[in-house]
């Protein structure tokens, strides 16, 4: 078996381990050596139904390594019972709580990337200017 010489492959497991420590946000199955996927089920839409039927308001964030900087973009929406995110506006009464979970995660992610992994973090060019999170 050949020894991998791609630095992104070599450090992928280390990055996964460190990013997993941020909490239940990282979805390893959706990650690649230079791209990572996070999400958060912020608000349960109906807690009175069976757990496997529940839907959630929340967000998902993707980041990709580009020239020693991780570029991110995120979206808000509903995690449906089929297990997929659907981009949808968050109802006004839940916007504060959903945004708060994203901001809290972003602070942790920013510190983790800059202090532990020694990478910068910046918004992707595809992220609308009105959605950009500033560094903590």
Predicted features, each with a name:
Residues 1-24:
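N-terminal "first-domain core" detector
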Residues 1-7, 52-60, 64-67, 123-136:
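Contiguous hydrophobic segments
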Residues 8, 12, 49-53, 88, ...:
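Short, charged/polar micro-motifs that form catalytic or ligand-binding hotspots
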Residues 24-67:
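Amphipathic, interaction-prone secondary-structure segments
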Residues 53-96:
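Intrinsically disordered, low-complexity regulatory segments enriched in Ser/Thr/Pro
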Residues 86-136:
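Compositionally biased, intrinsically disordered linkers/stalks adjacent to structured regions
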């Amino acid at each position: 078996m050949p020894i991998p010489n791609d630095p992104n492959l070599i450090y992928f497991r280390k990055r996964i381990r460190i990013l997993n420590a941020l909490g239940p946000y990282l979805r390893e199955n959706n990650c690649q050596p230079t791209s990572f996927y996070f999400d958060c089920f912020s608000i349960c839409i109906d807690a009175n139904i069976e757990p496997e039927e529940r839907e959630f308001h929340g967000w998902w964030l993707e980041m990709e390594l580009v020239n020693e900087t991780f570029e991110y973009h995120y979206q808000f929406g509903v995690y449906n019972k089929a297990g997929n995110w659907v981009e949808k506006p968050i109802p006004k009464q839940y916007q504060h709580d959903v945004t708060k979970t994203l901001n809290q995660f972003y602070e942790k992610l920013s510190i983790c990337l800059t202090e532990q992994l020694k990478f910068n973090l910046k918004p992707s060019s595809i992220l609308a200017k009105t959605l950009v999170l500033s560094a903590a």
